Curated annotation (Swiss-Prot):
Name of the gene this protein is made from: S4
Protein source organism: Aedes pseudoscutellaris reovirus (isolate France) (ApRV)
Protein name: Putative non-structural protein 4
Lineage: Viruses, Riboviria, Orthornavirae, Duplornaviricota, Resentoviricetes
Length: 1003
């Protein structure tokens, strides 16, 4: 299987990169009247699919140079009669010039290439068509028109040419109708085609060749027949007469036929509106939109690629079509904006889509990238190129100035073509993608052929998935060091020697590799064959265990460190330099049995080597990982920024866990994926009576510096979302306003000996992205949010309320533990069981407890955890709010069983503030003000309740909130299948129903 894949991949790359000169003569066998003639063709650039070549070889069709040139037909905008006859004339840009469509359809016929496997019986209509074709061919040969030939190979197993399938059918069965369509600026009476059954049969044949599922073929046929329906056509004619009265008909019918049939039909099948941009002489001419069955023309000055789905752009009659699978139409995104390498931007993905989507398997599909535009002639598969770095596509709001695009195309095409010439050897291409395959092997141990192609080619379609697939994650992990690997490969290629040798009849590569390192190292000689299961850098192949697909560093040395890890390390921007040493390599080797992915292995080894904890942050995934190595509370924050291809270590003071009774030290706080918009690091320190804040975004490096003195800047535990446009931080504060520094992102805890930093497991990630962490504190003080893990395997949350004196010292600290289970991530935090501890002099003291420990699908598990805590409380004899110090066992419970991690919900909370639908719940859950007089709490809704009943009141408010339907509407809960056994009110989950039952019973 591996050798077959190697040969297929070699064939593909040789076609793509070895045959793209300015112009090159190819030959193609054209069957004309059962006679084979070889006609030279001047094709500027051809990119064909290896599957097509293989299929044609099976059909016994001879192919010169391993390519199947596809004829290039474009319609020139010149109406000169003399130039209409010059079909073979070539313009300066290398495009074929043919006469306008009306004359072309009268005299010539273009068909798809057919196989010779099976012939159908020729009907009388076919015979008449054949006669006309032969007459037309005779006229063409007499007039010297040799560049366009009619391809006459019968019938069934066609090699489909995307974009012209329906066009070819209409050319075959309705030439006069198409002429009327163009001439009279309307669709005409296409439904009068002589044999609709024959047309549908041809359509089914072509759709089947596209490897579409049978259901899709039936639907396409049905929709196409519906398209030909008289009623629909009458609507089209009426709409067009109204819309196109001001459009020049000469401009209208010059456009390719397929743009009016193929694209609208596919868009209609997919129920997606599309836009067609027409550019004339560098100026935006028209924007054609399809809505249901109506075409609308409107003049625009610029186009927003985020809101408009562009299916085609016509620049001076040259069609630009985004060549993507029909199931994934072009949707511009922020994906891969910083990629500047053209080497891997056009990959073979046929096998992947054949297995995964059963979609078209004849495309060479590119990455989805706003900078990639495909310029086509008649057919998108004929000729294409990309524009790797169009600055107009990356401006503010991704608005492109259309009038500049035409000038950019020619320049970028030449730039791209030169880049392709730089690819000298196919082996480098293999080894370039081998890293991706190898990383996948580390995770799964094996690769299917479709996965090999997928990882090597199209891993940037992440936006079409709700969650990132493992293959997408694997590919993106190496993008952090993409530029470093490119430089490493360039140096490696300059020092390699390759020669073919014979070894037991099998070809293999004998490679001598010289790896530059800090010390002189001998060359490594090895003899290995190209195999997809061990494709990796030659300096590391021999250390791969081929059976287990893991590293085997039994003979590990300095060379390996510089062969692989130095490449990854080259882009690391450490404040404190870290050298790759033998000791570090030994640490990596010792961590191999952990079966970590490549980034986790690197991070864990670095953490052990530095003897400090590492918080690793992946901005692209909004994901944090804690590498807990030493338990010494020496925290370092490392960011793997895949977009910028950098790894950065942020260095802070060694007194990271300094208490707040002392002056403020620079600290770090990490927002854990609460929002997909921003993630922040906040540093603050105490200067005089002011808390100075320095805050910068990990996303875009925006920095916000200011002084905390007013709630509208950071807020009293409810900070506003930083916005440089709306908030000004450059002002002089009033000293009298500074009473406490409640910085949401900059959390400090004065009992770090009771807690250690940790990060939630990825399986619990969705807890933090849900409403569970969306509510603000009950009090008006700072809220610290921590995620804890109990040794029984259950999970609870800890909300820490901290208040300060005017001098910045800690006044009071309350920690609320809330029981959490993965099955109740949608449950509101107020409905979860809880117990509150008051921290005094480093000792946790029971403050209050909530009897509500019911949950939806795991009531027993939650109750066990809650009882586990109550057993320790019971041993101390604590009753309700009596102040007693817990014994050593309870201290041990808090110290060893609970693993907190600082979280921030600023962004999510801001989103809730902006959402009026959540205001009802917010009144009681987010904006409660505690008053320690008479132990009562004043609620914004006007209710004053005793502290012991505040949870009950919040339950009632939440239940009313559910009754209003807001919870159902916000969480896409389409049914309320649970009811209270007392009042029979219906709720979206059993937990709400149980709480309602408790309230009805007077608890």
């Amino acid at each position: 299987m591996q050798m077959e894949f190697k040969e297929e991949l070699c064939d593909m790359f040789s076609q793509i990169w070895d045959h793209i000169p300015d112009s090159q003569n190819f030959s193609e066998e054209i069957i004309v009247d059962e006679k084979i003639e070889t006609v030279p063709m001047d094709v500027p650039a051809i990119v064909t699919h290896s599957t097509n070549v293989k299929l044609l070889e099976e059909m016994d069709v001879e192919i010169v140079h391993g390519l199947n040139p596809i004829k290039t037909l474009m319609f020139d905008g010149i109406n000169d009669d003399d130039e209409q006859g010059n079909v073979g004339e070539t313009r300066d840009e290398g495009y074929y010039t043919v006469e306008p469509i009306d004359e072309f359809v009268k005299t010539k016929t273009v068909q798809t290439l057919k196989s010779l496997r099976r012939k159908r019986g020729v009907t009388s209509q076919d015979g008449a068509d054949d006669t006309n074709k032969h007459d037309n061919m005779h006229m063409m040969l007499q007039n010297g028109h040799t560049s366009i030939q009619s391809i006459e190979i019968e019938h069934d197993n066609a090699v489909p040419l995307s974009g012209v399938v329906i066009d070819n059918i209409l050319n075959k069965y309705g030439q006069d109708k198409i002429f009327n369509l163009r001439k009279h600026n309307q669709y005409g009476t296409i439904y009068h085609i002589s044999d609709v059954n024959m047309l549908c049969e041809e359509l089914i044949c072509n759709a089947t060749q596209l490897n579409l599922p049978a259901a899709a073929v039936r639907r396409i046929t049905f929709e196409f027949c519906r398209w030909l329906n008289e009623t629909e056509l009458l609507k089209l004619q009426c709409n067009q007469l109204e819309k196109f009265v001001s459009v020049d008909s000469t401009e209208w019918f010059k456009l390719p036929v397929s743009l009016y049939f193929d694209i609208p039909i596919m868009a209609k099948l997919l129920n997606i509106p599309y836009n067609l941009i027409i550019i004339r002489e560098g100026v935006l001419f028209q924007l054609l939109s399809l809505s249901d069955t109506t075409f609308e023309l409107q003049q625009v000055e610029h186009l927003d690629f985020h809101t408009n789905q562009i299916l085609a752009i016509i620049i001076d009659d040259h069609v630009t079509v985004p060549l993507l699978p029909l199931k994934k139409l072009w949707n511009i995104s922020d994906l891969a904006k910083n990629t500047d390498l053209p080497l891997d931007l056009c990959e073979d993905v046929s096998s992947y889509f054949k297995e995964e989507d059963k979609a078209i398997n004849t495309y060479i599909t590119p990455y989805i990238d706003p900078r990639i535009i495909f310029i086509a002639h008649r057919n998108p598969t004929d000729f294409m190129f990309m524009l790797p770095n169009i600055p107009y596509l990356t401006e503010v709001n991704s608005e492109i100035q259309i009038d500049k695009l035409s000038d950019v195309c020619e320049f970028e095409y030449n730039r791209y073509r030169k880049a392709l010439f730089c690819v000298e050897n196919l082996i480098e291409i293999h080894r370039w993608h081998s890293l991706v395959c190898f990383i996948h092997l580390l995770a799964n141990g094996e690769l299917t052929q479709s996965e090999q192609i997928f990882i090597a080619g199209i891993s940037r379609t992440n936006e079409y998935y709700v969650e990132l697939s493992p293959r997408d994650c694997l590919y993106n992990t190496i993008r952090a060091s993409f530029s470093a690997y490119q430089a490493w490969f360039k140096d490696w290629r300059a020092n390699r020697k390759i020669q073919k040798i014979q070894n037991n009849g099998n070809d293999s590569l004998h490679t001598v590799i010289e790896v530059k390192s800090q010390q002189e190292c001998p060359n490594i000689e090895q003899n290995t064959s190209i195999n997809v299961n061990n494709l990796f850098f030659n300096t590391i192949i021999k250390y791969l265990d081929h059976e287990q697909h893991r590293f085997n560093f039994s003979d590990f040395n300095q060379q390996i460190a510089h062969g692989h890890f130095e490449a990854l390390h080259a882009s690391v921007e450490f404040v404190s330099e870290i050298q790759i040493t033998r000791e570090f390599c030994d640490v990596i080797r010792s961590n191999l049995p952990l079966n970590l992915d490549i980034i986790s292995l690197y991070s864990k080894s670095l953490s052990d080597y530095l003897k400090m904890d590492l918080v690793v942050y992946f901005p692209e995934y909004n994901e944090l990982r804690l590498i807990d190595a030493t338990k010494q509370f020496k925290i370092r924050f490392i960011e793997f920024n895949c977009t910028k291809k950098t790894i950065t270590m942020f260095k802070y003071t060694t007194t990271f866990h300094a208490s707040m009774q002392k002056s403020y030290n620079y600290q770090v706080s990490i927002s854990n994926g609460m929002s997909n918009k921003e993630m922040f690091i906040t540093c603050f320190k105490k200067e005089s009576n002011l808390a100075v804040v320095k805050q910068f975004s990990l996303r875009n490096n925006h920095r916000y510096d200011g002084i905390i003195d007013q709630p509208n800047i950071i807020g009293k535990g409810r900070p506003n979302y930083p916005n440089t446009k709306e908030q000004s931080v450059d002002h002089h504060p009033k000293i009298s306003q500074v009473k406490h520094a409640s910085v949401e992102q900059g959390h400090l805890i004065n009992n770090y000996d009771l807690m250690k930093f940790a990060l939630c497991h990825q399986n619990y990630k969705r807890i933090f992205n849900n409403q569970l962490f969306s509510e603000a504190p009950i009090s008006d003080e700072s809220l610290f949010r921590l995620k804890l893990e109990v040794n029984t395997g259950q999970h609870i949350l800890a909300f820490t309320h901290v208040s300060f004196y005017e001098d910045g010292k800690v006044k009071t600290t309350y920690v609320t533990f809330i029981t959490v289970d993965i099955d109740c991530s949608h449950v509101h935090q107020a409905l979860l069981p809880r117990c509150v501890f008051h921290i005094q002099k480093g000792k946790p003291i029971l403050y209050a407890a909530n009897k509500t420990f019911v949950t939806g699908g795991s009531e027993r598990r939650i109750e066990v955890v809650f009882n586990h805590l109550k057993e320790y409380i019971k041993e101390t004899g604590i009753r309700s709010r009596d102040i007693h110090t817990l014994n050593s066992k309870s201290d041990q419970l808090i110290t060893t069983c609970l693993t907190p991690f600082i979280l921030s919900s600023m962004s999510m909370r801001k989103a809730l503030q902006d959402n009026g639908d959540l205001s009802f719940t917010s009144q009681c859950v987010r904006k409660c003000q505690m008053s320690f007089k008479d132990d009562r709490i004043n609620l914004p809704c006007g209710t004053s309740v005793h502290e012991s009943t505040v949870d009950l009141h919040k339950h009632a408010c939440l239940l009313e909130y559910y009754r209003l339907g807001l919870y159902k509407e916000k969480n896409n809960m389409n049914r309320c299948g649970f009811s209270c056994v007392e009042c029979h009110s219906r709720y979206p989950n059993q937990l709400c129903a149980n709480v309602c039952r408790l309230i009805c019973q007077g608890m």
